[in-house]
Amino acid sequence: MAHKKGASSTRNGRDSNAQRLGVKRFGGQVVGAGEIIVRQRGTHFHPGVNVGRGGDDTLFALSAGSVQFGVKGGRKVVNIVVPA
């Protein structure tokens, strides 16, 4: 048994905080303008009608309505359906 810990053992022991990514409002849920719908890295979901994209690829509602997920041109898109 070694009486010393080893060369690199004290250099370990760090961990980063979770980034809390993912879908925050799901399909059919009602959102207000400015509410965050998806937090993501890269464009897993693309912005559709009444949806904006932030500098960190976060999708947010541009107007109040209900969230709708769909596919357009082979891409997953998020739309906000405004009640008539």
Curated annotation (Swiss-Prot):
| Keywords per UniProt | Ribonucleoprotein, Ribosomal protein
For molecular function, the Gene Ontology terms on record are:
structural constituent of ribosome
Q: Which InterPro entries match?
A: Ribosomal_bL27, Ribosomal_bL27_CS
PROSITE patterns in the record, alphabetically? Answer: RIBOSOMAL_L27
- What's one Pfam family here? Ribosomal_L27
The Swiss-Prot or TrEMBL record describes its family as follows: Belongs to the bacterial ribosomal protein bL27 family.
Q: Write down what this protein is called.
A: Large ribosomal subunit protein bL27
Q: Which organism is it from?
A: Clavibacter michiganensis subsp. michiganensis (strain NCPPB 382)
Q: Corresponding gene?
A: rpmA
